[in-house]
Amino acid sequence: LSKGDFTHTPELYLADEAMMRGETAFTPRQLTDLNPWFAGMLSEPRELWMDTLDGESRVQGFVFPPQGMEEGKKYPAVVYIHGGPTPFIGAALTYEHQCILGAGMGLIVMNFRGSSGYGEAHQSMTRAYDGGAMTDILQFTDLAVRECPWMDGERLGVTGGSFGGYMTNWICGHTKRFKAAVTQRSIANELIQYASSDMAGSSKDYADFSDFMMEQLKKSPVSYAEKIDIPFLILHGMNDMRCPVEHAHQLFSAVRETHPDLPVKMILFPGMTHSFPMGGPIDLRIAHYDAMIGWFKKYL
C-alpha cells in the first residue's frame, strides 16, 4: 500500500492479510524512503475544528506556520480555498502550499460546507453557494488568527483556483477582510459558465429565461467588481475549457475600470488548461507560482 501525509511524499508499505482485515494491529513495514533529503524542512500543520455559526455543521481545517518560523515574530498568512467545491483538504503533501510556506508566509486551509467527507448535509452544493462557504471561510480565518500568536491578522491574503477562485472573487467583492488576492482559473461570470464551459449549465428550472439570466448575474463576482479594492492578481490558462479564459478578461476589465489606480494584473498562460498549474510545462508552472508568491510578498 501507499501512504503519505502533509510533509511526506507517498511511500510504499507492506501489510499482511491479518492487518488488512483488522485482526492484528495495523503496523505495516515501510519499504521505500524516496525523499529523505527534505525531512524536517517542511511545515507541519495544526488541526483546528469549529462549529459553524448557524450550528448546522462542524468544519475541520489546518493552519501551517511558515517554514523556519522564529519565535516571537509575526508573519503574514494566506487563506487557500480549495476547488470543487466537493473535494477536501486531506493529509497529503501539496507542493503549492509548501511553496507559500517557504516564502515566509503562513497558510490557512479548511473544509468549508460544500466539501466532501463530512456527510451529505455538509457537502450540499446549495450551502457552498448560498453564503455558507464564505461564512465558514471567514469564521475559520478568525479562529486561526486567535489560535496562532505568530499570525498577523492584519496581513492576510486569499487565493484559490476554480471554485476557490470563484470564492476568492466573491469574498473580495463582499468583505474587507483581506489585504491582497490572487485568483486562479476562476469563475467571474456565471453566464460564461452557462454558455461556454464544458460543464455548461441549464435554465430548465426557471419558468422565465430572463429571470434565469438575472439570477446568474446576481451570482457572478464580476457584478461586484467595484467593491474589490485590494491588490488583485488574475492567473488563467488560455485553453481552460472548464472555466474559459473570458472570465479572466471580464474580471480584469471590470476591476481596472472601476479602480484605475488599484494594483490589478492579469497573466495568461498559453496552451494551459484547467489542470494548470498542477500539470503543464515546468517553466510555466514555476512562472505561475513565482507570480502568486511575489504578489503576496509585495502586498502583505
Spans of model-derived segments:
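Glycine-rich His-Gly loop
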Residues: G4, Y80-G84, G237
